[in-house]
């Protein structure tokens, strides 16, 4: 049985960017599975809340995010997926977020991204990082099994619809999303896949996605979806935007990206969106945390050939 004192110790340990021992991860994930099992495909979220986009294993930048947005549980958070892959510290990043979820289940909402998948993590880094840090794939297996239970979308006060990717031609209403069976690996196609893979586009209607999964959707689609479901806004992540946030479709859609200097080379700002009482929306932008080497010195930006 995981108790608060134990969780607080784990969180303190993880905040130093140190992985938890495998047996602790196993205990944590068992408890987290119970928590996520009780959440819905469209998980209700109360305001005020701070909405965050992709993190991608950039642990020190996530710590910077908490400095700017406030610590959990003082601030209520909603994360829209992609905690792992690409960055150097996927293990510590996802373990900390899941620990916070188990410790403060009402103060942090963690949605599934397209990288919270067995197939994608075997290609983009999380699997290899688990092998490197634990000497086996057990922790990767524990987390990828847990990812199947993450809610697909969040709904802030019935007005702001939050998800990782975008809309689906197979889904007109939130009720249709509520009926999906989400407890599975991210499919290659279909409505659940689209929610995690699709992107807004300048072209109207539905389009074939250059990503090879999901669709592109135009302003006509997002406007219809918002009107039909009495929504004010679709908030999503999934795409690098240089300022950290980007409005599209005449403010029917906003993209939020929370990994600054993405992949340690893109030079972008990161942002979080604060939804206050009265549905006022404000953005906080931030730059990367200083990166420290093994001796504690601050490194220059890593040249491309080390990536």
Swiss-Prot record:
Swiss-Prot/TrEMBL cofactor(s): Mn(2+)
Residues engaged in binding Mn(2+) 1: 54, 56, 82
* InterPro entries (alphabetical): Calcineurin-like_PHP_ApaH, Metallo-depent_PP-like, PPA2-like, Ser/Thr-sp_prot-phosphatase
Q: Where is the active site?
A: 115 (proton donor)
- Which top-rank group of organisms is this from? Eukaryota
Its top-level enzyme class, in one word, is hydrolase
The record lists the organism as Acetabularia peniculus
Enzyme Commission numbers on file:
3.1.3.16
In this chain, Mn(2+) 2 is annotated as bound at 82, 114, 164, 238
How is this protein named in the record?
Serine/threonine-protein phosphatase PP2A-1 catalytic subunit
What catalytic reaction does the record list? O-phospho-L-seryl-[protein] + H2O = L-seryl-[protein] + phosphate; O-phospho-L-threonyl-[protein] + H2O = L-threonyl-[protein] + phosphate
Q: Which residues form the signal peptide?
A: none
Region Disordered, as annotated, extends over 286-307
Cofactor: binding comment: Binds 2 manganese ions per subunit.
């Amino acid at each position: 049985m995981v108790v608060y004192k134990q969780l607080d110790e784990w969180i303190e340990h993880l905040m130093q960017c140190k992985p938890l021992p495998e047996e602790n991860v196993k205990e944590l994930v068992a408890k987290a599975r119970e928590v996520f099992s009780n959440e819905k495909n469209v998980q209700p979220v109360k305001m005020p809340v701070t909405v965050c986009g992709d993190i991608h294993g950039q642990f020190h930048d996530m710590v910077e995010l908490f400095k700017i947005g406030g610590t959990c549980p003082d601030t209520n958070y909603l994360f829209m997926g992609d905690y792992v892959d690409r960055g150097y510290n996927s293990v510590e990043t996802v373990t900390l977020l899941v620990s916070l979820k188990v410790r403060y289940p009402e103060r942090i909402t963690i949605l599934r991204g397209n990288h919270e998948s067995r197939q994608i993590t075997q290609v983009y880094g999380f699997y290899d990082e688990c092998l490197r840090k634990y000497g086996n794939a057990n922790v990767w297996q524990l987390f990828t099994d847990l990812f199947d239970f993450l809610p697909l979308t969040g709904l802030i006060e019935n007005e702001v619809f939050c998800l990782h990717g975008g809309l689906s031609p197979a889904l007109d209403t939130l009720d249709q999303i509520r009926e999906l069976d989400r407890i599975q690996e991210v499919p290659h196609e279909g409505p659940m896949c689209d929610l995690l893979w699709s992107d807004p586009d300048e072209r109207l209607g539905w389009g074939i996605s250059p990503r090879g999964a999901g669709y592109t959707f135009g302003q006509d689609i997002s406007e219809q979806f918002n009107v039909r479901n009495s929504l004010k806004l679709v908030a999503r992540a999934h795409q690098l935007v240089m300022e950290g946030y980007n409005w599209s479709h005449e403010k029917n859609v906003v993209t939020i990206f929370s990994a600054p200097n993405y992949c340690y080379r893109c030079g972008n700002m990161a942002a979080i969106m604060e939804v206050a009482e009265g549905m006022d929306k404000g953005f906080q932008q931030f730059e990367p945390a200083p990166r420290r080497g093994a001796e504690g010195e601050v490194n220059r930006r890593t040249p491309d050939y080390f990536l």
